[in-house]
Structures are given as structure tokens and as C-alpha cells.
């Protein structure tokens, strides 16, 4: 079965694995991991990037042919997130943005009220908005209604590696979405990424699971394989769960 492409807004991607860059020990290891992942879209925190720098992260992404996706990491209000997105548009010449508005540093949980406010303003300003949100199906629908090009619910808090805490919530978001659903945050290992795709997500975004692994390039390759396997399994259709056993070969 041929694997279809991930389509977000007016762009398509062969890979359904979106990478982040936070937590990488150095650019050399990050480069190996990005290559192993096969990703075509990678987030960069605009606050940590010198757009005029010489041999930095942006140069690496450009050399690898990977599209940078600026994010508003660190923003605590809609106003702050909007300003960061506007600066990213000027610096990187892109109207794509991963929107993050965080409530506090301890949980790194999205602030729903400020997130929706920022999304509304950025969509009105012509941005292609990919919001990092909670696993609340109502909030996901609200963000979609504002005109966001995708919704990106968390599996569990950023950097925890706890996997998908509420699989049913993710399924509800998928069932009601008319835009791509990208599982964002909480991935710890390859089975988490496969589960996200089996639940119906269109893509997975992860960073720490690779950058903080003992062997980042090897884990990146594992994540790429897991995302593909989970997607193909979802498309193929799993067998129904049964209470009693059923012989695979008939007795007669």
C-alpha cells in the first residue's frame, strides 16, 4: 500500500515525523539525528536563533533541505506570542508558525485563553498557525474554528516522556477534526509514536525523545520507523478486540 503524503495548508511532506531541536548536545549529533529521522519540517525556537548567524542551526537545516518551523516557545501571553511570530516572519521569511503560549514553567501546559487569542490574531494576520494545545477536544475544535491549519495536542507534558496519557481524548480530537492532527509532546519511545499514529494522528512532533536519548541518531531512526508503522497499521485496519479466543484456522 502506497503511503500518502502529509498535507498541511498548501504544503505536502513525505515524512510524517516533525522534529524539534531543543535538548541537542551539539549540532553534529543533531545533524545525524535529523538525517536518520527523514524529517522535512523541524521546529526552531526563534528566541534562541540568531537569524543573521553564520554556521548555526538555520544553516544546518538549509544544508539538509529541511524546512524550519519557527515556534513561539517561552511566550506567556497572546501579545508576546504574536510579537515573536511577527519577528520570526521577518527573520526567516515564512508565515508558518508553531504557536505556543505557556501557562507556567512547572507544567509547560498551554494557556487555553491566551492560545485562542493569539491564534485568532495570527490567522487574521495571514499566518499558517499550528497551535500546541491540550488534549481537550473542545479546545482543539475552537482552534480549528479560528482557522488554524492543524491542531497539535499534547500526549503528556513536554519533556516527561510519559507517552499518551489520554488516548481516548486524542481519538476524540481526531474524530472531530477537519484539519491534520499532530501529536505534540510527551513521546518517550518508539511505541508512543506508533500509538499516536494508530489512534489516527496525521503526524508526530517530538524533540526530547531523540535529542536526550542515549543514542539520538538511532532513536531518530526508530521514531521514523514507528511513525510509518503506526500510520500503515491505522490505514490497514486492526482486527476487532474480542473477549473470547477465536481460532485463526477453522477446525473443519
UniProtKB/Swiss-Prot annotation:
Q: Name one Pfam family in it.
A: ThiG
Q: Name one GO molecular function term.
A: thiazole synthase activity
Q: Which reaction does it catalyse?
A: [ThiS sulfur-carrier protein]-C-terminal-Gly-aminoethanethioate + 2-iminoacetate + 1-deoxy-D-xylulose 5-phosphate = [ThiS sulfur-carrier protein]-C-terminal Gly-Gly + 2-[(2R,5Z)-2-carboxy-4-methylthiazol-5(2H)-ylidene]ethyl phosphate + 2 H2O + H(+)
- Kindly list the positions annotated as binding 1-deoxy-D-xylulose 5-phosphate: 159, 185-186, 207-208
Top EC group? transferase
Q: Which GO terms describe its biological process?
A: thiamine biosynthetic process; thiamine diphosphate biosynthetic process
Compartments where found: Cytoplasm
**Cellular component aspect of the GO annotation:** 2-iminoacetate synthase complex; cytoplasm
Q: Which domain of life is it from?
A: Bacteria
- Gene3D superfamilies recorded: Aldolase class I
Does the UniProt entry include the keyword Cytoplasm?
Answer: yes
Sorted UniProt keywords: Cytoplasm, Schiff base, Thiamine biosynthesis, Transferase
Please state which protein family the record places this protein in. Answer: Belongs to the ThiG family.
What job does the chain carry out? Catalyzes the rearrangement of 1-deoxy-D-xylulose 5-phosphate (DXP) to produce the thiazole phosphate moiety of thiamine. Sulfur is provided by the thiocarboxylate moiety of the carrier protein ThiS. In vitro, sulfur can be provided by H(2)S.
Quaternary assembly: Homotetramer. Forms heterodimers with either ThiH or ThiS.
The identity of this protein, by name, is Thiazole synthase
Which species is the source of this protein? Mycobacterium tuberculosis (strain ATCC 25618 / H37Rv)
